Amino acid sequence: MEIQFQQPNMQNQKAGISVTNKGGKFKGRNRNSNNTNKFVGVRQRPSGRWVAEIKDTTQKIRMWLGTFETAEEAARAYDEAACLLRGSNTRTNFITHVSLDSPLASRIRNLLNNRKGDKKQEDGAVASAPSNSKTTISNTSTITSNDDNKESTLSTCATRNTELFEDAYKPDLSNCKEVFESGSQSNISCGFGPFFDHFSFTQLLDMAKNDDITDASSLELSEFERMKVERQISASLYAINGVHEYMETVQESNEALWDLPPLCSLFC
């Protein structure tokens, strides 16, 4: 049995096939895969071409450097970009001398400038938010102050209007009683329409005196009638537009009662 098991091994030895050949094949594949990763920032596509790419986490930049025929060309492109972004002390694949006039250098400068511009815009937007709120508060206070000014202006105008009306002409009726008494002595009654009910002011007073009424209620009634007549006189005088027109209407009813020049001088 042992001879039979050894015969396949002998045949394999004669054929030159060893069991460890598979392991050697796998080792060879591992060597090839290691060769693809020996450069930093370089990877190979399925088509066989080489790609270079660089990332910078501090500045949040990821830049595509291009596709190359060989891994060395892709690695040198990565080294140049790394030196421009991170400085000469960064890790590189080769000893690299950076050219500031290369197309890659101009691309990286433009990328950095755009990144700085975007950052400034973001900072400006954040800073403008509090200023907008302050502007809104100031506008609100301005509107409030304007409303206060309007209210004060309206109150001032109302005060001035009140003063203006206080300065307006108001006829003095203190001597009206004497005029009516003098008119009653001459037995002339002045008819002022429905306001006086065809009775003069002095006749109402004489009726209360001559009747000798001792009842308190009757006295109160006569006093009420007297006040009513006085109010009617005041209302009629204020309703007439102009003292001159008022005097003309009175003069037409009884020219002998009124003396126009003395009354005008009294009111003036």
From Swiss-Prot:
Induction: Induced in roots from 1 to 21 day after inoculation with Sinorhizobium meliloti. Induced by Nod factors in root hairs. Residues 131-146 have a biased composition (Low complexity). Expressed in roots, root hairs and leaves. Expressed in root epidermis and root hairs. PROSITE patterns: AP2_ERF. One of its GO terms (cellular component) is nucleus. Keywords: DNA-binding, Nodulation, Nucleus, Transcription, Transcription regulation. Residues 1-36, 114-154 are annotated as: Disordered. Residues 38-95 bind DNA. GO terms for molecular function: DNA-binding transcription factor activity; sequence-specific DNA binding. SMART domains: AP2. Disruption phenotype: No visible phenotype under normal growth conditions, but roots of mutant plants, are impaired in the interaction with rhizobia, and in infection thread (IT) initiation and maintenance. It is found in: Nucleus. Belongs to the AP2/ERF transcription factor family. ERF subfamily. This is Ethylene-responsive transcription factor ERN1. The lineage of its organism: Eukaryota, Viridiplantae, Streptophyta, Embryophyta, Tracheophyta.
